[in-house]
């Protein structure tokens, strides 16, 4: 029993990543916290709901690039709280993106 506990502790210590895990969102595009999900949406309903929201086809370098990626497919660049089933709850325009 003691051997198992010590072996599990040792295995857990070995399994910890040695380098920092990179964030999937660019902090320059969307703020960290609630509005951290990047989506391209057809319609933004008063910032409460974004319709037909999909993830961008590529990782944006900055806010302008994010806007260009979404514009290619005829959508608007938005930062959302909860994207579910092509709908995103609570959306806002990223800083540096024009309407």
From Swiss-Prot:
What upregulates it? Under normal conditions on SDAY medium (Sabouraud dextrose agar plus 1% yeast extract), the expression of hyd2B is increasingly down-regulated to a hardly detectable level on day 6. Hyd1A is the most active at transcription level under normal culture conditions, followed by hyd1B, hyd1E, hyd2A and hyd2C in order.
Signal sequence segment: 1-15
Keyword Ribonucleoprotein assigned: no
Q: List the disulfide bonds.
A: 30-79, 40-70
* Pfam families named among the record's database cross-references: Hydrophobin_2
Q: What is its main location?
A: secreted
State the compartments where it is located: Secreted; Secreted, Cell wall; Vacuole; Cytoplasmic vesicle
Q: Please state what is observed when this gene is inactivated.
A: Does not affect radial growth and multiple stress responses.
This protein's UniProt keywords: Cell wall, Cytoplasmic vesicle, Disulfide bond, Secreted, Signal, Vacuole
Q: Which GO terms of the cellular component aspect does the record hold?
A: extracellular region
Q: What is the annotated role of this protein in its UniProt record?
A: Aerial growth, conidiation, and dispersal of filamentous fungi in the environment rely upon a capability of their secreting small amphipathic proteins called hydrophobins (HPBs) with low sequence identity. Class I can self-assemble into an outermost layer of rodlet bundles on aerial cell surfaces, conferring cellular hydrophobicity that supports fungal growth, development and dispersal; whereas Class II form highly ordered films at water-air interfaces through intermolecular interactions but contribute nothing to the rodlet structure.
The record's similarity note reads: Belongs to the cerato-ulmin hydrophobin family.
Q: What is the name attached to this protein's record?
A: Class II hydrophobin B
Source organism: Beauveria bassiana (strain ARSEF 2860)
Question: Which gene name does the record give?
Answer: hyd2B
């Amino acid at each position: 029993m003691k051997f198992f506990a010590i072996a599990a502790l040792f295995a857990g210590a070995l399994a910890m990543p040695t380098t920092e895990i990179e964030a999937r969102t660019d902090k320059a595009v969307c703020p960290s916290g609630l509005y951290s999900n990047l989506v391209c949406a057809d319609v933004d309903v008063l910032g409460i709901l974004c319709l037909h929201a999909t993830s961008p086809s590529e990782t944006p370098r900055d806010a302008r690039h994010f806007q260009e990626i979404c514009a290619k497919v005829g959508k608007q660049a938005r930062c959302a709280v909860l994207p579910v089933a092509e709908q995103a709850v609570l959306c806002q325009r990223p800083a540096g993106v024009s309407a």
